[in-house]
Amino acid sequence: MVLRLPDPSHGGGAPPHDHTEDEWFKERYGGGGGGGDAPRSSRAVNPVPPYGRRSALAPRRKEDFGDGGAFPEVHVAQYPLDMGRRGGDGDGEQRGSSGGVLSLTVDGSGGRVEFDAVVRQGENAGKTVYSSPGDVLPKINAAAADADDDEQAAVEETTARTSAALRAIVEKRLSAVQPSNTLASNHDPEFIKYTPARQTSAFNSGAAERIIRMGETQQDPLEPPKFKHKRVPAPAGSPPVPVLRSPPRPPSQKDHDDWKVPPSISSWKNPKGYSIPLDKRAALDGRGLHDVQVSDAFAALAEALYAAEQKAREAVETRAKVHTEMKMREKEKAEQHLLQLATKARAEMLGAAPPAPSERSKAAAERDAIREERRRERRLEARAAAAAASKKSAATRDRDRDVSERIALGMANTGGGGGEVTYDQRLFNQEKGMGSGFAGDDQYNVYSGRLFAAQPALSTLYKPSKHGEEDPDAYGDADEHLGKIAKTRRFVPDKAFTGAPASVAAGKRERPVEFDGPEMEEDPFHLDQFLTQMKKGKHQ
């Protein structure tokens, strides 16, 4: 790049520019403002070489920059006015390493910030500072304090040993992951005093000697190895000791059976779908090796539950019988009371005293009472049966009926359609439908049958509404409405198509137009014809 730059305006033999005569140099180093008689600075001044001749320039001090910035064509670390230098500010004044800023520290026990580090710095660094609340508490028992110190020492020793063991494990794991060609350098850098051969001001920045720091270059840990190490094969050792063995014998059937290892059978997975007998699975589970012990408490519990159930049933039956008898007695008392009232009323109406009962009349009365009681029981049973039959609702009566008795399958539903939707269970077990492939592979029709398959259902679709009967003034009579429908020629169903022959003209229709689908061919893809042609070609 230096070779491509233009030549300087002055000739190559011109002397270098002396910055000591510049105004900025006189003002900075005491050379200006006092006239020509003012004493100049006794500090050595290194004139900056002209542009294009700075290959040997290495500015290190502030004077080398000439109160200016860094030289971009000089490829060394430059700090004009100590800007960017560690430990220095922009004015060239050195500061301390700390800079008056206290670093944040935490304690080792709980990770809490040590705020008392503010009072422990400076002149208090070597003193004992009581800054925690525990420092103001008095120590009552010195022996307990000593015991606590011993315990604390034991805890610290155990912690140190544990930490060392964990650190060793972690270092071992990390060393196994790190690359093997990383070399640890323990050599300290060497400082060499260098005196250049040329002592002029144009070389070595005017320095008579220089101290060079020499150290090892840091190696890239990811750099591949430069040399390939080959492992030397191990030398042949001593021959093995001969072992005397008996000659091999053919294994018997028992040996084969003993060496048969059953396959592993899982109780949870069977990915290959093997059929494993239950006895083999139970034997593999090992449950047959354990003796099953059934506790006697199970039998006692079952017996107690059975006895309690029988007692509860007997109690319920007894309670029901007593309740029924009480109702019967109440009914008998009511009937007897009514009979007495009726007898008394008839006697009062006749005006005659009732005859005195005799022995024969008493026996007849007992027989009549028995007959009346039996007749009353039969009447009560008949009433109960009639009440039970009358309580059976319509939904209960239709529950046992088949759906086909109430609806017509395969016909249009022209009714109101209100109420509960009823389905025939026989329709769910057919081979047709969306759940079973919808239709056969050789069928191309969308519907399995015609929409209107019966004439009686279609006749109801063209009936006039019943509004005429309810309000003849608004809608007219039903016959009149039907006549209007019959005379209406809006769609002209009996008119033939234009261009069609006259014989094709259709008459009046009583139902919608039905379109017949194309006849299904037995071989829609003409595979039989193709195979026949192929066979003929082979024979030819």
Curated annotation (Swiss-Prot):
Domain of life according to the entry: Eukaryota
Span list, region Disordered: 1-106, 215-273, 351-402, 502-526
Regions of compositional bias (Low complexity) in chain numbering: 383-393
Any GO BP: mRNA splicing, via spliceosome
Keyword Lipid biosynthesis carried by entry: no
Alphabetical keyword list: Nucleus
Ranges of Pro residues composition bias in the record: 236-251
Keyword Nucleus: yes
Alphabetized InterPro entries for the sequence: SKI-int_prot_SKIP, SKI-int_prot_SKIP_SNW-dom
Entry GO CC: spliceosomal complex
Main location: nucleus
UniProt-listed PANTHER family: NUCLEAR PROTEIN SKIP-RELATED (PTHR12096)
Protein name (Swiss-Prot/TrEMBL): SNW/SKI-interacting protein B
Organism expressing this protein natively: Oryza sativa subsp. japonica
Gene: SKIPB
